[in-house]
Amino acid sequence: MKLAVYGKGGIGKSTVSCNLSIALAKRGKKVLQIGCDPKHDSTFTLTGFLIPTIIDTLQSKDYHYEDIWPEDVIYAGYGGVDCVEAGGPPAGAGCGGYVVGETVKLLKELNAFYEYDVILFDVLGDVVCGGFAAPLNYADYCLIVTDNGFDALFAANRIVASVREKARTHPLRLAGLIGNRTATRELIDKYVEVCRMPVLEVLPLIEEIRISRVKGKTIFELEELEPNLKSIGEYYLNIADQLLAQPEGIVPQELADRDLFTLLSSFYLSDQQTEKAYSSIQHVHGSVGEGCSAQNSEQNQTANDYSFEFI
């Protein structure tokens, strides 16, 4: 199983990814986490340090793949999770998608890519250009990390569009949303009510999760010293169990930007304005909850072309 984790920059994707990787390992799976961010800090809480990147290693070997061994690029992390950092090109030059491709190519040449039960790609921010959408080429499921905020759901909606596009040519499905650092979930619920998709879990705003990142450890590692944190780990184990059940997943249909603005802004408006916002969206997407039929291309085109007046 191959998973690609996306979401708005700073939303906590790496924290979710590391804890989810350990949760999957605790369920008996052999897990590899691949960081796909030029900052190369995805696996920091698993290994305790910034591991050398694939690009660093390739450069040191003058790109002679035959001189590279698995131990040169794969590092053991906490809980038996193996870790790889793809790295990235110099700032302002090159393409991150090329780096992801080179990483997969190298792992295949090392006969490592198919040795794992689960490979998890932790991907840079909400960038969904052709380059950083590259992990979707290899993934079975996409997971989108969001919170209950306006900007995070806008980013999630753009990622949904990328999943829909990639699913046309790849066996990719959206597994669902993961709410992170979320005290309330009204906007998340409003979004999935119109654009139907699973919500795998909603993690509340828990200070211990933030502190764990600062300490360079996962919740599961801190749990060994503080048993009272065990209940927090259950959130990640729940997500792992849902994924290991191999859900059917969905090919989602994103909302047009203006529709999404109208939908989410209606949360802060009067009842009369909210009713107007919903009627505008229903005019294009049909009854609420039917807006994500990926098969209805005509409806999709209408949604893209229709212009709504901001309230």
From Swiss-Prot:
Any GO BP: photosynthesis, dark reaction
GO MF terms, alphabetically ordered: 4 iron, 4 sulfur cluster binding; ATP binding; metal ion binding; oxidoreductase activity, acting on iron-sulfur proteins as donors; oxidoreductase activity, acting on the CH-CH group of donors, iron-sulfur protein as acceptor
Cofactor notes: Binds 1 [4Fe-4S] cluster per dimer.
Localization (cell): Plastid, Chloroplast
Keyword vocabulary terms for this entry: 4Fe-4S, ATP-binding, Chlorophyll biosynthesis, Chloroplast, Iron, Iron-sulfur, Magnesium, Metal-binding, Nucleotide-binding, Oxidoreductase, Photosynthesis, Plastid
Enzyme class: oxidoreductase
This protein's record includes keyword Membrane: no
Its EC number(s): 1.3.7.7
InterPro entries from the UniProt entry: NifH/chlL_CS (IPR030655), NifH/frxC (IPR000392), P-loop_NTPase (IPR027417), Protochlorophyllide_ATP-bd (IPR005971)
Predominant place of localization: plastid
Pathway in which this enzyme or protein is active: Porphyrin-containing compound metabolism; chlorophyll biosynthesis (light-independent)
Reactions that this protein is recorded to catalyse: chlorophyllide a + oxidized 2[4Fe-4S]-[ferredoxin] + 2 ADP + 2 phosphate = protochlorophyllide a + reduced 2[4Fe-4S]-[ferredoxin] + 2 ATP + 2 H2O
Chain positions recorded as [4Fe-4S] cluster binding sites: 95, 129
Highest taxon of source: Eukaryota
CDD domains on file: Bchl-like
SUPFAM superfamilies in the record: P-loop containing nucleoside triphosphate hydrolases (SSF52540)
Cofactor(s) listed in the protein's UniProt record: [4Fe-4S] cluster
Residues bound to ATP: 10-15, 39, 180-181
One Pfam family in the UniProt entry: Fer4_NifH
Family: Belongs to the NifH/BchL/ChlL family.
PANTHER family, A to Z: LIGHT-INDEPENDENT PROTOCHLOROPHYLLIDE REDUCTASE IRON-SULFUR ATP-BINDING PROTEIN (PTHR42864:SF2)
NCBIfam families: DPOR_bchL
Function: Component of the dark-operative protochlorophyllide reductase (DPOR) that uses Mg-ATP and reduced ferredoxin to reduce ring D of protochlorophyllide (Pchlide) to form chlorophyllide a (Chlide). This reaction is light-independent. The L component serves as a unique electron donor to the NB-component of the complex, and binds Mg-ATP.
Subunit structure: Homodimer. Protochlorophyllide reductase is composed of three subunits; ChlL, ChlN and ChlB.
Protein name as it appears in the record: Light-independent protochlorophyllide reductase iron-sulfur ATP-binding protein
Organism: Oltmannsiellopsis viridis
